[in-house]
Amino acid sequence: MNSIRTGMCTPVYKIGAPTILFRTYSSILTFVPKCEQTKDSDLLRLKEFIDKHNNICILTGAGISTESGIPDYRSEGVGLYAKSSRRPVLYKDFCGSDVIRRRYWARNYVGWPRFSSIEPNNTHKVLKKLEDAKKVRCIVTQNVDNLHAKAGSRKVIELHGTAFKVMCLNCDRRICRYSLQDILDRLNPNMTATSQMIRPDGDVDLSQEQVEEFVVPSCEACGGVLKPDIIFFGDNVPRQIVESVKYNVEHSDSLLILGSTLTTFSGYRIALQASNAGKPIAILNIGKTRADDLAKIKVEGRCGDVLSRISTMILTS
């Protein structure tokens, strides 16, 4: 395996001085778009695709994590864009503004206890079983939530980084996000917040007063600016990650796309590479994707439901 990257770090975080309250969702499926029951014929086609291939590159998107309670950006009626006028922070804005960085880290600090405690769902668990069964070459995930690693998958490439690490923009030093939470606890002992909705990258809404009073640390090694080790909108995927993905797609025998519309080019170009190389492509998603015309098989449905229904057949056949 070439340059597999995972964001797993050992949890050492304890909720300390801040009082952070979260309202319980009525269902973990709050952020999953409505869809019809997947047809048995489509289940069989997807099962046969996985049965036939033993070196699959799997590309996952935000649609697989909605079943764990993390919203995506674009799902009709339930995504962040449908529920809020707020948009994700741009890379240039984060780097260029102390005010924007303070707001980002304040929101991220309050959202972290819940975001970091979210558990893998059936999709992550089935992919781990497929990996154990030697069906998977690698999992390329566009998600930053660490859920593949939590499920036990080891062959993971984090295309857009991980929210579970923090990097210095000056010296490139990296620390575990749990360690930063301890530092933020000490710097902000009186922080109190209530939140209704977590964001795809783990932050929440706060009042202007709460943001203005929030203290953000600098890098302990050089005094530089700290940034989550994720690819913000407007940023570029590191070259070594791009090359790792290209290598693994080239040496795979197929591409399986799960829970992604492939709206961002960093994901879509993986489908293009596979198609140009003659690799068969299967897609499981709710709604249209940018690569539908490249796919040999397109199945509509919830990833966790569909994969759970066919996993026993796949793994025992």
Task: List the model feature ranges, each with a label.
Residues 1-317:
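Conserved catalytic core of sirtuin-type NAD+-dependent deacylases
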